[in-house]
Every structure is written in structure tokens, then in C-alpha cells.
Amino acid sequence: MDKLLEVRNIKAQFVTDGNVVNAVDGVSFYLNPGEIIGVVGESGSGKSVTMMSLLQLISSPGRVAGGEVYLENGKDNLLSYPPNGEKMREVRGGKIGMIFQEPMTSLNPVLTVGYQIQETIMLHLGLDKEAARAKAVEMLKLVNIPDAESRFGYYAQQFSGGMRQRIMIAMALAAEPEILIADEATTALDVTTQAQLLEMMQDIAKKTGTSIIIVTHNLGIVAQYAERIYVMYSGHIMEHAGTKALFRRPEHPYTRGLLKAIPRLSDPKGKVLVPIDGLPPNPANRPPYCPFYPRCESSERTDAKRAFPRCG
């Protein structure tokens, strides 16, 4: 199968007080047409920076330090485009849509939500104002905003957090992108609203053929919605597997530690969760071997320096 998106060895750095912080250090992954994948990891693992890097949205003091990004087996490396050039703007929103982490602050408070969606449609699809307005209302209906016609003229602060996130999804899908990146898209919402939005995104993906990358720290979300999972830790991919295989037979000690540390409904009463001792390494001084090595309790720990990233 031809890959829809292929990311090769992407690196992102931040320079602070003379130190180079390698936030993302050689991450590679791929996405197939119509597929939903998950990228999971704890806070600070580099998930969001990876996604921002492939769209060249990293601003100073950060920079994309290397790597390649290809769409549909194309010959052009997206990272070779000028960050603010026309080609990169066509990719952002037009080919790859992104739902950002903060629905409360990602919408412009002085413009109506309808206008913000309409503007995206006019820019990427080339529709006139009236056609773009009709398309924007259609998108609001698609994400189940009640009375979409009148709420086209509402401002962000007139909606609840869950409704704002629906609007963010509508905006990300408005230009009919082939790929949707959902970066912690439901983190600040209650579990019922989370489930509703994730099921809605899954349904929309099936209807439109859109591929989705779910970026989250919540293993339960990717267990239910993703077909494949990439596990990130300290700027690296530690493990990649099909969802069922990863939960049944995790290979890397870090993945095994994560699964031992989360509660499950099927757990017997009184089961004690096992935390992972220690802290992630300083990304400004990360070792050249497996970054989980100092915290690893695996019997294969002595091989970790040789066998990174799979030392389990």
C-alpha cells in the first residue's frame, strides 16, 4: 500500500541559555490512506513538537534541525519548502488539518466562528464568499452544532468548551484535508464529551476517507480508536505495533511499564499499580543510548545500550 504520509528521522531543537535541547531526536513514522494511528507518550515526550515540526510551525528559539516529510510518495520534502511560502501554506489546512490542544484559546475572540471557518474555505478551496458561507454552515452541522445557521454569527466565548472543540474540528476539516492531526484534542473535556467527539471524528473519517493521527497521553483513547500505535519517550519512538499486539505483547520495557501503571476495569480488586521510578533524562544532555536505560528494570537492561530502541 502506498503511504499517505511518511516522516523520516525528523529532529527539532530549542536553544535556551546557550544549551541545545533536542526535543525530538530522529522520529520516523508513516500513515496509510484512511487509517487512524495513535502517537502516545507522557508530557514532554515530544509528541506535539513532532507534529508542529512536520508542518513547520516551530517558532524561535526552536527550529526543525533535520528530517524529511513526504506526502503521497511525492518527491518533494515538505521541510524543504520555505516555512511561510505558498507551498507550505497549501499543505497546512489544505492537505493536513490540525486540531490544537487548547480549544479555549485557539479561536479568535473578536471574529465570529463562522467567519473563521469561511476564511479557511475561501483560502484553500477558492470558493466565493457565499459558497464558502454555505460550506461553513454545512461543516457546523457535520460536527453537530445545533442551529448552525444562526450560530455561524456567534463568537467563541458564547460556546462551551465541548462546542468550541467541535468548531475546531469543523475548521480543521473545512478545507477537506487528507490528514487530520488531533493533538490532545479532548484533554480538557469531560469523559462523556471526549467519547462523543472521538466517535464523531471516527465517523467523519469513515465518510470522507480522511486519515487521522491521534496525539495523546491517554492509552485508553488509542486502544479504542487507533489501528496502530507509536509510543514516544524523551524525543524518540520507543515502540511501534498494531494496537492489539501492543496491548497484548508490549516489547519495550517502557511500554510494559506504562501498561502496568494504568488502571483497568478488568483488574482484580486490590491490585496495586506499579509506577515507573525516576524521571526522563534532560533533553539537553540525553545519552546516546536508550533514554529509558536509567529507569529500566528489565532483565535485558544490560543490552539497552546496544539494542536501542528495542531492548526488551
Task: Map each language-model feature to its residues.
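A short, proline-enriched helix->beta-strand linker immediately N-terminal to the Walker B motif
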Residues: 174-178
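The feature captures the beta-strand-to-loop junction immediately N-terminal to the Walker
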Residues: 40-41
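P-loop NTP-binding/switch modules centered on Walker-like glycine-rich loops
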Residues: 181-185, 189-271
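ABC ATPase NBD Q-loop/coupling interface
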Residues: 68-90, 246
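Charged, flexible cofactor/metal-binding loops and thiol motifs
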Residues: 242-312
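ABC ATPase nucleotide-binding domain helical subdomain, centered on the C-loop/LSGGQ "ABC signature"
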Residues: 126, 130-145, 152-153, 256-260
